[in-house]
Amino acid sequence: APSGFMGMR
């Protein structure tokens, strides 16, 4: 999954 997924948290 893209880093954006973790960045959203």
UniProtKB/Swiss-Prot annotation:
Location relative to the cell: Secreted
GO biological process: neuropeptide signaling pathway
Record has Secreted as a keyword: yes
Record's keyword terms, sorted: Amidation, Neuropeptide, Secreted
UniProt entry tagged with the keyword Nucleotide-binding: no
Modified residues annotated as Arginine amide in this record: 9
Tissue expression pattern: Midgut.
Residues in the signal sequence: none
Any Gene Ontology CC annotation: extracellular region
Primary localization: secreted
Function: Myoactive peptide. Increases the amplitude and frequency of spontaneous contractions and tonus of hindgut muscle.
Protein name: Tachykinin-related peptide 4
